[in-house]
């Protein structure tokens, strides 16, 4: 159970990091 929760947290952090990186690259392109 604990492994599943930790894996889910890691996935959520990775998704958020990818989303921030994607928006950051788009902002750099627009400038």
Curated annotation (Swiss-Prot):
GO MF annotation list: electron transporter, transferring electrons within cytochrome b6/f complex of photosystem II activity
A GO cellular component annotation in the UniProt record: chloroplast thylakoid membrane
Lineage top rank: taxon: Eukaryota
InterPro entries attached to this UniProt entry: Cyt_b6/f_cplx_su6
Gene Ontology biological-process entries: photosynthesis
Keyword Protein transport assigned: no
Matches recorded under Pfam families: PetL
Record keyword ATP-binding present: no
Membrane spanning residue stretches: 3-23
Function summary: Component of the cytochrome b6-f complex, which mediates electron transfer between photosystem II (PSII) and photosystem I (PSI), cyclic electron flow around PSI, and state transitions. PetL is important for photoautotrophic growth as well as for electron transfer efficiency and stability of the cytochrome b6-f complex.
Similarity comment text for this entry: Belongs to the PetL family.
Subunit structure, as described in the record: The 4 large subunits of the cytochrome b6-f complex are cytochrome b6, subunit IV (17 kDa polypeptide, PetD), cytochrome f and the Rieske protein, while the 4 small subunits are PetG, PetL, PetM and PetN. The complex functions as a dimer.
Name assigned to this protein: Cytochrome b6-f complex subunit 6
Organism of this sequence: Gnetum parvifolium (Small-leaved jointfir)
């Amino acid at each position: 159970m604990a492994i599943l929760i930790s894996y889910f947290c890691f996935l959520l952090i990775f998704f958020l990091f990818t989303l921030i990186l994607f928006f950051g690259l788009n902002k750099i392109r627009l400038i």
